[in-house]
Design a protein with these regions (language model features):
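Solvent-exposed soluble domains appended to multi-pass membrane proteins
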Residues: 1-102
Length: 102
């Protein structure tokens, strides 16, 4: 629950510091929300953090590229961006990160 709590609190820096411990926590695959968070972090922080022995699913990278494209298209109007992204990505970590108020 430690890593999930970091995501709920939108603490991506501490999440990225601790993601190498994924195997220590018993994971054999990167959970989808962890993967989404790490792809977002790597993109916006210009990093290449991937836990040893793990890889990103191509479909998640493709979804992120689609998300980023829609966000870029509507970024001048946050309400419209939220609406458009919500149509397809409402259940993604990316949407939570950018639009959920905690």
């Amino acid at each position: 629950y430690f890593l999930a709590t970091l995501l709920l609190n939108k603490d991506l820096d501490f999440f990225a510091e601790n993601i190498p411990r994924l195997k220590d926590f018993g994971y054999t695959d990167i959970p989808l929300y962890f993967e989404e968070a790490l792809i977002f972090y790597n993109f916006y922080e210009n990093k290449q953090i991937i836990p040893e022995g793990f890889s990103f699913r191509p479909e998640t990278i493709a979804r992120f590229n689609e998300y980023a494209g829609i966000y870029t298209k509507f970024r001048s109007d946050r309400a419209v961006a939220r609406f458009e992204l919500g149509k397809k990505f409402r259940n993604s970590y990316w949407y939570y990160l950018q639009f959920a108020i905690i």
